[in-house]
């Protein structure tokens, strides 16, 4: 095993000479590069969830298997998504800035900072893989209504409704995007779809 802290696409061909397996993390590996790989390479492993940095068609053409780590940091990403929702609803940043600036009167009286409770609010989740499911679990614990759009139709579960994308966007107070970046999902959220959302 040979490990490099950092490799550019330009350095890759030299560094993989004689390798059977390549493990990479988010480095762009396009088709032109993959087609130049030595015949010894049989597997490219993306050390993360996303693999949009790899040309899958070129790898298939060269007989190279590609894999990823679907559960990589799923809980951490889910926590971050929920943390952002809670931050938006509590305006914590505004409160902390007021406090830091010595604005204790308005801070303690809550005159300038409206609070929004997330319980009872609707969370729209786009993508129901490892991360989407982890977000659902936390949102259920927060007593949120949950709408989910996924490319694979599913039956509703306790507290979770699977619906089309338009329904998610029109009815959600918050939307959390957790689908892979593919040609089908790129620009899924755009000016037109954002216009469907609540003001």
Which ranges hold each PLM region?
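An N-terminal-biased, well-structured beta-alpha scaffold segment characteristic
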Residues: 1-67, 170, 190
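Short gly/ser/thr-rich secondary-structure transition/capping motifs
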Residues: 2-7, 24-27, 101-110, 155-162, ...
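Short glycine-/acidic-enriched loop or helix-start segments at secondary-structure transitions
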Residues: 31-34, 54-56, 78, 135, ...
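Glycine-rich NAD(P) Rossmann-fold beta1-alpha1 loop
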Residues: 49, 71, 129-132
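Phosphate-binding beta-alpha-beta segment of Rossmann-like dinucleotide-binding domains, i.e.
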Residues: 62, 70-122, 137
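Short beta-strand elements at the ligand-binding edges of bilobed clamshell
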Residues: 65-71, 162-165
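Rossmann-like dinucleotide/phosphate-binding beta-alpha-beta segment
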Residues: 111-199
